[in-house]
Amino acid sequence: MSIDYRKTVNLLDTPFAMRGDLAKREPAWVKRWQEEKRYEKLRKLAAGRPKFILHDGPPYANNDIHLGHAVNKVLKDIIVRSKTLAGFDAPYVPGWDCHGLPIELMVEKLHGKDIPAAKFRELCREYAKEQVARQKKGFIRLGVLGDWDNPYLTMDFKTEADIVRTLGKIHENGYLTKGEKPVHWCIECGSSLAEAEVEYEDKVSPAIDVGFKVVDTDKASAAFGADAAGAMAVIWTTTPWTLPANQAVAAGANLDYQLVDTPKGKLILGKDLVESAMKRYGVETYRVLGEAKGQALELLQLQHPFYGRQVPVILGDHVTTDAGTGLVHTAPAHGLEDFQAGLQYKLPIANPVADDGRYKSTTELFAGMLVWDANPRVIETLESHGSLVHKSKLEHSYPHCWRHKTPIIFRATPQWFISMDRKANGGETLREVSQRAVDATEFFPSWGRARLDAMIKNSPDWCVSRQRNWGVPMTFFIHKESGELHPRSAQLLEEVALRIEQQGIEAWFSLDAKELLGEEAEQYRKLTDTLDVWFDSGATHFAVLKQRPELAWPADLYLEGSDQHRGWFQSSLKTGCATIGRAPYKQLLTHGFTVDDKGYKMSKSKGNGIAPEEICGTLGADILRLWVASADYSGDMSLSQEILKRTTESYRRLRNTIRFLLSNLSDFDPLEHVVPLANMVEMDQYALLRAREVQEKVVGELYSRYAFHHVVQEVVGYCSEDLGAFYLDVIKDRLYTTKADSHARRSAQTALYHITRSLLLMVAPILCFTADEAWNVLVDSEEESTLYHIWHEFPAQTVEREAALSSKWQAIRELRAAVNKEIEALRSADKLGSSLQAEVEIDAPAELARHLASLGEELKFVLIVSKADVREAGEVAIRVSPSAHGKCDRCWHYRADVGSHAGHGAVCGRCVDNLDGQGEPRRYA
């Protein structure tokens, strides 16, 4: 009776399927993880370990999550999981930013504007709560592990109270100031904007040259050494609407100016800009009458171009000759540099523009006009007064509101600021403390340091007050006459904070001042301003990290998009330094934006976005997570259907490797079958050494410096080159054809067991679903998780033994690659079938020849040929020829003894021994 030899080989199966079906199966795993309370279990397991705290920058509670959200949360999850596997207690408390204008606008859209303030805030709170639930569902679907049942919300009563306390501490430390300063003002918002709320877009503006007639002719003539009668000092501006607020013309003290006679009259211009100005005016013939330093023009009186008042020439360091005329129109109410110069010269800070962007009723010529509509009227007025020298248009970068995408204005308003340059109680300015804190912070990528440092160096005072309804109130009492804060502000603020803990911000808005001030209430009013939402999120290091027992201050890491250098990173830095004197983080990591395959930023309006929900629903969250990890987040991260296709292919290769490993461990019990390292087949010892080297690089170097795309490259390369193309390829013969319980096979399985554990733990932070699916198969328990363990610990040998192993097997691998090249050449020429049909003769130098010869008959298994002979020679030479022998039906080797064994068909003696005898011994391969 013939034997079916296919049934005699050790081809095992595994419940770990070839196809992941992630999109269908992941939701069930998510549900099971929640039911098992994995996060809570992990906290108990990690209790007592050193902590690693990643503080979540709160996304805004509005609309579904987009791809940028997914990138951010997946990167955070990879870090939290990898730190957990590294032996840390790494809790993750997700958060949401819940106050602010976008929610107000949505509530107005849904319910209208005519709503009582208290009811409006209630509706805002309800809306934010709905949005949090909506986004939470999306983040959980991504496999992000965290305390989803107890997130922090900036609208939590306790958090609102602690935000108020943070403000109080900043006031106590002497950094809070009040003043009328020019701030970014959005007409549509009806509120000031923080730096982080301003975006720059291209805009076409009128560009005009305006003449200010010289009043003090004698002073000007003396300065230029020429007759200046009838001369005009010329400024250039792209904001004609600010001219009603003009109070001076600024010159550079050390810049050279010329008095130029032109067809347009006598003009005073910066020397370096005369030629470009004449070209702009279309003037070909002109004559320089005289020259003077800016210093000589200081306090020269000029006539306002259309009002009756006179304005002086002042000196300012901000004046340059890069463009324009070298003289600068100065309106202290409409620009920060103008404002600073105005303070120095005690100029009026006259703001003619109201909150709605219209000129106040007292503004001569332009009362009631919207500033943008006034530009043509201002130009007409200049023409009628003979003050317009030239007009044109200019496309330039201009600040816009990030919400409305509309141009904003600078206008002086009474606001509250956190001062950057006031020496506070500690004797240092906030700028000094903040710059020292930046120096002490580690940045990923490293260029983030220069960016944040430059922002702190150039940061104006932080305007923290807003004229909004839905926000944390600035809970101060202001004296009605003096405008000063109540002398007991610190005590009163704490009393209010205690009430807010119980009732939320409504405790302040509904508060009768008499409850806290008694008879003093007649002299004080409640401040009605709310805090900038960047202050809310910036204060969460105090409101969350310092208040929750499972967390710690400062955080080890803040991780957000690169736009947060000017946003959350900066607001957190300033509140940390202003309250505690240092940054609330040790490390900052920034990632780029998501772009399409053409490099364009993804957006709904362009229709080039891919929603996380779509990817999870078709391919699975693990594919999305693998793409995030594979992309170099230090720059913009490209995604397209083609990139997703390539990512899916990489995933399949990884999955197939894991499936092969698990299949060949189906009958392996680590408690019973493990072979001690010293007794293992030599190639298996080398495989463990390589696996450990890879893990040490991935864990000790790449994960620790957050180089996830290099983690993926290293792991994929290892699976492809070390495992697929070498080790697994070689040991198939031993796994399949030796006796099931033989030392040779159990040695290979021991190596595979260590490799599988290590590999699954290395990919677990990235492929959280797949790694746990495979882990459950490996340990035969659905209640197990990779996260309940730490990085795999390999058995180790002496340094000398490992060095010898590595040197020997690296040389053998290089020789094997050369043999394969020769075999492939014959196969391409149709002179050879499989590599097992080949017989090989090798000439090699002495050391390599000794390495090869030491394997004896087992060299052929390493080369996957049927015969291999080695001869010492001066250089490597390889000769490959087809075997003349028959093919074994069981192991497919070509041997002389095939078919020569009684009771067996076309099989070789090796297979007969493995079937009926003691089994073949293996020492090397």
From Swiss-Prot:
The keyword ATP-binding applies. SUPFAM superfamilies: Anticodon-binding domain of a subclass of class I aminoacyl-tRNA synthetases (SSF47323), Nucleotidylyl transferase (SSF52374), ValRS/IleRS/LeuRS editing domain (SSF50677). It is found in: Cytoplasm. GO terms for cellular component: cytosol. Keywords: Aminoacyl-tRNA synthetase, ATP-binding, Cytoplasm, Ligase, Metal-binding, Nucleotide-binding, Protein biosynthesis, Zinc. ATP binds at residue 604. It comes from the Bacteria. It catalyses: tRNA(Ile) + L-isoleucine + ATP = L-isoleucyl-tRNA(Ile) + AMP + diphosphate. It is an enzyme of class 6 (ligase). Pfam families: Anticodon_1, tRNA-synt_1, zf-FPG_IleRS. Zn(2+) binds at residues 888, 891, 908, 911. Its cofactor is Zn(2+). Catalyzes the attachment of isoleucine to tRNA(Ile). As IleRS can inadvertently accommodate and process structurally similar amino acids such as valine, to avoid such errors it has two additional distinct tRNA(Ile)-dependent editing activities. One activity is designated as 'pretransfer' editing and involves the hydrolysis of activated Val-AMP. The other activity is designated 'posttransfer' editing and involves deacylation of mischarged Val-tRNA(Ile). NCBIfam families: ileS. This is Isoleucine--tRNA ligase. It comes from Chromobacterium violaceum (strain ATCC 12472 / DSM 30191 / JCM 1249 / CCUG 213 / NBRC 12614 / NCIMB 9131 / NCTC 9757 / MK).
